Regions:
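N-terminal hydrophobic/helix-forming segments and targeting peptides
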Residues: 1-465
Length: 465
């Protein structure tokens, strides 16, 4: 190739590179340190409640205080508010008025899981089980025959709330059984999404009876006695409980080279942690920087702790009131990075991806101009100017990024909180970490992509305009 053609190619054509061809040794060390901290966050926060607690603890260590309505705030002040124990909003007050807008990163900290039903405990054939109702878009067959924990709370009539933790390392864990292949012929002929019906996702919780042999439900009684002895609860208390079955495995490095992280809950705690950590690591920004860690995204962002809730508006309104700024003025000048994961190209399932418009492992933070399904249904389609703004911001900050869609046009689709932020008249763009095996009990991400997403969040918070 002539030098002229080489120069023309470099001038006119994209030349995406594997991020490892760009990072130096110091950056690689920073990446590893960041990912070590992220794995600790994952292990501490297997539910939205636990994630919120871990985030609050980290924030308070860095000088954040709980916001009280009417609190006088000045540039550099760091505040947070917790939404019913399951969502979190944090802010670092900027030098400029909120009339100039805010720089927002909105992620979610709920993940697909199995929730206990209100009346979960039963006995059948002298084995005790918990009935579950799956939460979010799971592939049901992936949840059988893996070790599970039970985490959550039981709210009692007297107003007390009991934390429940069953199945940590070294303790007895729970499991959902599956059919042996010797008798699985009929099951094997069913479509994959029908082979394991939702009503069969029952947690095996005991088999040892107590009492006399003629008594009924002796195994169920034994399980309930164990729970009462440890937590002081009765069967009736399940009616006011939020108990979640989540994978027991901890976050681990993946690959002979240790270049990836495998864990439950990357979607979307990988972006939630990046946004949180970026906010904790900045000094006084020009514009007020806001991190949102929302609940209920996996089921449509509904409810008081979801992104459609007025809780976010109330928090921002309180901040604006302190500066005599109308909330609508802040929103119309604000920018939001809807921080959610995207699908990483998997060559084992190449038929559902459009390779030219897919996110690749180790190519950095994945921008998504739109999500949705088929004809962009349910999408927040960012305008060209918004994408250009982030391109320039990331390039100036040295962030490695790529742009992608979720998959082939008619192969499926997905959504994020972007539409709910955009509906508030906030300029919004989706961006996040590419994930392999998304929504599985054990997902995989690249360490490099995690680190670059953190850098991208930090660049948004530190933006001058």
């Amino acid at each position: 190739m002539s030098e002229e053609m080489k120069a023309l190619r470099e001038q006119l054509l994209r030349n995406d590179k594997n991020g490892y061809d760009t990072l130096d040794e110091a950056q690689l060390r920073e990446m590893e340190a960041y990912c070590t901290d992220y794995k600790a966050f994952l292990n501490a926060g297997k539910t939205e409640r636990l994630s919120a607690r871990a985030a609050i603890a980290a924030a308070e260590e860095r000088g954040f205080v709980q916001y009280k309505r009417g609190m006088a705030l000045k540039a550099g002040d760091k505040v947070y508010t917790c939404n019913r124990g399951k969502g979190l909003m944090l802010a670092v007050i900027g030098k400029e008025s909120l009339a100039e807008g805010a720089q927002i990163a909105a992620a979610h900290i709920d993940s697909p899981r199995l929730d206990l039903k209100p009346t979960p405990l039963y006995e059948d054939s002298e084995m005790a089980y918990f009935k579950t109702h799956y939460y979010g878009g799971i592939r049901k067959y992936q949840w059988v025959t893996i070790p599970l924990q039970l985490r959550g709370v039981v709210a009692k009539k007297d107003g007390s709330v009991v934390d429940v933790c069953i199945g940590e390392a070294g303790e007895p864990q729970l499991v959902i059984t599956d059919l042996l292949p010797h008798l699985g012929g009929e099951q094997g002929r069913k479509p994959l999404n029908e082979a394991v019906p939702g009503e069969t996702l029952n947690l095996l919780v005991g088999s040892r009876p107590i009492g006399d042999s003629e008594d009924k439900d002796r195994v169920k009684l034994h399980v309930m006695k164990r729970l009462h002895d440890k937590y002081g609860i009765t069967e009736s208390d399940f009616a006011s409980a939020e108990l979640e079955a989540v994978p027991a495995a901890e976050a681990v490095d993946i690959g002979i080279d240790g270049s990836m992280i495998g864990s439950y809950g990357h979607d979307d705690r990988v972006c939630g942690y990046a946004a949180l950590r970026a906010l904790l690591d900045i000094e006084t920004p020009d514009k007020t920087a806001v991190c949102v860690l929302a609940d209920k995204e996996e089921i449509g962002s509904m409810g008081v702790t979801g992104m459609q809730s007025a809780a976010f508006d109330a928090f921002m309104s309180d901040l604006c009131d302190g500066q005599n700024v109308p909330l609508k003025a802040c929103f119309e000048n604000a920018f939001c990075l809807s921080a959610d994961v995207t699908a990483a190209y998997d060559p084992n399932f190449a038929e559902v991806y459009e390779k030219r418009n897919s996110a690749f492992v180790n190519y950095g933070m994945g921008l998504c101009k739109y999500t949705g399904a088929r004809g962009k249904s349910g999408a927040s389609d960012a305008d060209a100017e918004t994408v250009a703004y982030i391109r320039n911001l990331f390039d100036e900050a040295g962030v490695i990024w790529q742009i992608a869609e979720l998959g082939k046009v008619d192969a499926g689709g997905g959504g994020t909180v972007a539409m709910y932020m955009a509906n508030r008249n906030i300029t919004t763009l989706d961006a996040g970490v590419p994930v392999l095996s998304m929504h599985a009990p054990f997902e995989t991400v690249s360490k490099l992509d995690c680190y670059e997403t953190y850098k991208g969040m930090k660049a948004v918070f530190q933006a001058e305009k």
